[in-house]
């Protein structure tokens, strides 16, 4: 059985073919065969029982994609790979008014992760901040105003600050044009023509007559209600008397029924007596 590292090749001009007759080859010939293979001396690791040496031996070099995620200035294994001599500078970040980049912090060591490239969004605090954040987002009222053309929205340049209020300038509305949205419906001006009532002096004759008519109507309704109550009570009394009469009638009929039943029970005995009396005579 041949070894895995032995290969068959054509004999050269000045070389004798190898003979496997059981004789052991010299150390020089075997060393030339495995010249391309790398060997690792494990004696130092086997003799010492330290786990750090074994972890250093079986350390796996990370993929290039994983190293690129950490940036060219931060090596994956600072103990084995040298740092990149070229300086790396992060590009300047342009954030909105509600974002800001982290300043220089405690992460100043060359092998540590630099969080300055991460943008942190500040959440608004308090009712003022929540109102400012709601204004900076999508506002359906602004869209409806722009669509209808009935009001003009003027937003100041520093709208991101919650202290500045939102100003709405109303334009004159057409009297015949109805509002296109119920949210933008203009309130009706307070006036006697829109309410349907006019101011009446309490000392005037018209006001007194109206009050008198109202009082008369109230008295009539009350008297009518009282009459209905009396009629209902009268009907209740009549129904109760009728019920009593019906009950007495039922009792009378029950007694008559019992009497008739007793008579029918005595009829056959009377017939037999009559027959017996007729036969004896």
Curated annotation (Swiss-Prot):
Pfam families hit by this protein: bZIP_2
SMART domains linked: BRLZ
Residues where Phosphoserine is found: 181
Keyword list, A-Z: Activator, DNA-binding, Isopeptide bond, Nucleus, Phosphoprotein, Transcription, Transcription regulation, Ubl conjugation
GO-annotated cellular components: nucleus
Cross-link (Glycyl lysine isopeptide (Lys-Gly) (interchain with G-Cter in SUMO2)): 121
Region annotation Leucine-zipper: where it falls in the sequence: 230-237
Region entry Disordered, spans: 1-30
Gene Ontology molecular functions: DNA-binding transcription factor activity, RNA polymerase II-specific; RNA polymerase II cis-regulatory region sequence-specific DNA binding
All copies of domain bZIP, residue ranges: 204-267
Disulfide bonds: none
Subcellular location: Nucleus
Keyword Ubl conjugation found: yes
One BP term from GO: DNA-templated transcription
Start and end residues of each stretch annotated as Basic motif: 208-228
InterPro entries: bZIP, bZIP_sf, C/EBP, C/EBP_chordates
Principal subcellular localisation of the protein: nucleus
Post-translational modification comment from the UniProt entry: Phosphorylated.
Self-association state and partner proteins as the record states: Binds DNA as a homodimer and as a heterodimer. Can form stable heterodimers with CEBPA, CEBPB and CEBPD. Interacts with GATA1 and SPI1. Interacts with SMARCD2.
Its job: Transcriptional activator. C/EBP are DNA-binding proteins that recognize two different motifs: the CCAAT homology common to many promoters and the enhanced core homology common to many enhancers. Required for the promyelocyte-myelocyte transition in myeloid differentiation.
Similarity field: Belongs to the bZIP family. C/EBP subfamily.
Protein name: CCAAT/enhancer-binding protein epsilon
Protein species of origin: Ovis aries (Sheep)
């Amino acid at each position: 059985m041949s070894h895995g590292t032995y290969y068959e090749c054509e004999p050269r001009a000045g070389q004798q073919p190898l003979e496997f007759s059981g004789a052991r080859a010299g150390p020089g010939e075997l060393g030339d065969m495995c010249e391309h293979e790398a060997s690792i001396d494990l004696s130092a690791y086997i003799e010492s029982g330290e786990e750090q040496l074994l972890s250093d031996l079986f350390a796996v070099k990370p993929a290039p994609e994983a190293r690129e995620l950490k940036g060219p200035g931060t090596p994956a294994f600072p103990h084995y790979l040298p740092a990149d001599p070229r300086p790396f500078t992060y590009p300047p970040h342009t954030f909105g008014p509600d974002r800001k980049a982290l300043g220089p912090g405690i992460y100043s060591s060359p092998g540590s992760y630099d969080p300055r490239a991460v943008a942190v969004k500040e959440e608004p605090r308090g009712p003022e901040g929540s109102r400012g954040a709601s204004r900076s987002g999508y506002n359906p009222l602004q869209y409806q105003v722009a669509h209808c053309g009935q009001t003009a929205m003027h937003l100041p340049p520093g709208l991101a600050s919650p202290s500045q209020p939102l100003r709405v300038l109303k334009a004159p509305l057409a009297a015949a044009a109805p509002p296109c949205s119920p949210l933008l419906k203009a309130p009706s001006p307070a006036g006697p023509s829109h309410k349907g009532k006019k101011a009446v002096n309490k000392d005037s004759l018209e006001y007194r007559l109206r009050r008198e008519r109202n009082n008369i109507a109230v008295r009539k309704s009350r008297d009518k209600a009282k009459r209905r109550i009396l009629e209902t009570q009268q009907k209740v009394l009549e129904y109760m008397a009728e019920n009593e009469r019906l009950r007495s009638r039922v009792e009378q009929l029950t007694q008559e029924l019992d009497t008739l039943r007793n008579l029918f029970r005595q009829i056959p005995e009377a017939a037999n007596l009559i027959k017996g009396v007729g036969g004896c005579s």
